[in-house]
């Protein structure tokens, strides 16, 4: 269901107009980006998501809704409703574990996603990195950051190994173990891109876990494991800069200390690697 109202409504207006029998239940923890609440009627629950990024155009939020509308129930919650500034999606009953599932299970989930039809819009990291630089706190801009940004822009993004739909925010808190298997939530960064970019961006604990995931995916996708790992490593500096820039971006937007701590730690990792 999609509404054509062009003016963003408040949460209470959304509830009274479209979900009059529902009431707020608890806040939804869906990754670091937030912007969600759970509404309930008797035992039925729905996740109500708000467009929480004031710097992102409304089209980005609409893409999120369209991605969920395209995806099968074996991968993601169903999209239920959209109006400018808000969407409602199915609440997935299950267990969320901050740790990633084992390599074989996660590789199977990502491979299943990447066998789906493409979304129809490409993920482009270079303009996103430039946006994070321009939108961050000016006091946080450093010569090191600018040098790394210019070097990546000069080199250009790696040529894709294989284009497919990507989730681009795969970590334990965005994976729900339901009675029917693993499902991914929080699809706001989804788009089409290189499968190796998705694997490079997974929030792994260490290189050993990363290699296990890459090898499991290569076996399932029938790709040479060494070739896939080389491609993942080509994307690695882009992904680290993406994470650092996003933390800076969210720090400027929210002032929340968790983001500045994460940004500082990511910059330290980059400096250690030269």
Swiss-Prot record:
It catalyses: thiamine + ATP = thiamine phosphate + ADP + H(+). Keywords: ATP-binding, Kinase, Nucleotide-binding, Transferase. GO terms for biological process: thiamine diphosphate biosynthetic process; thiamine metabolic process. The keyword Oxidoreductase does not apply. It is an enzyme of class 2 (transferase). Pathway: Cofactor biosynthesis; thiamine diphosphate biosynthesis; thiamine phosphate from thiamine: step 1/1. SUPFAM superfamilies: Protein kinase-like (PK-like). Its EC number is 2.7.1.89. One of its GO terms (molecular function) is thiamine kinase activity. Belongs to the thiamine kinase family. HAMAP family: Thiamine_kinase. Catalyzes the ATP-dependent phosphorylation of thiamine to thiamine phosphate. Is involved in thiamine salvage. This is Thiamine kinase. The lineage of its organism: Bacteria, Pseudomonadati, Pseudomonadota, Gammaproteobacteria, Enterobacterales.
């Amino acid at each position: 269901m999609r509404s054509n109202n062009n003016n963003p409504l408040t949460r209470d207006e959304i509830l009274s107009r479209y979900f009059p029998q529902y009431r707020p239940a608890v806040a939804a923890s869906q990754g670091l980006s937030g912007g969600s609440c759970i509404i309930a009627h008797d035992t039925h629950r729905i996740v109500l998501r708000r467009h929480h990024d004031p710097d992102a155009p409304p089209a980005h939020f609409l893409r999120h809704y369209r991605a969920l509308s395209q995806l099968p129930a074996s991968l993601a919650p169903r999209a239920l409703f959209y109006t400018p500034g808000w969407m409602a999606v199915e609440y997935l009953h299950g267990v969320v574990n901050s740790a990633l599932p084992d390599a074989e299970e996660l590789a199977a989930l990502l491979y299943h996603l990447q066998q789906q039809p493409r979304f129809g819009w490409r993920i482009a990291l270079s303009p996103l990195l430039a946006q994070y630089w321009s939108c961050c706190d000016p006091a946080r801009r450093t010569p090191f950051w600018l040098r790394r940004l210019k070097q990546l822009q000069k080199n250009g993004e790696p040529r894709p190994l294989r284009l497919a739909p990507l989730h681009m925010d795969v970590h334990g808190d965005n994976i729900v173990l339901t009675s029917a298997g693993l499902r991914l939530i929080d699809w706001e960064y989804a788009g089409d891109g290189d499968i190796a970019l998705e694997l490079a961006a997974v929030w792994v604990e260490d290189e050993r876990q990363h290699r296990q995931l890459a090898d499991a995916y290569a076996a399932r996708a029938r790709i040479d494991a060494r070739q896939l790992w080389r491609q993942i490593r080509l994307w690695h500096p882009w992904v680290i800069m993406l994470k650092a820039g996003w933390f800076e971006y969210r720090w400027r937007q929210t002032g929340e200390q968790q983001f500045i701590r994460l940004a500082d730690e990511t910059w330290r990792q980059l400096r250690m690697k030269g």
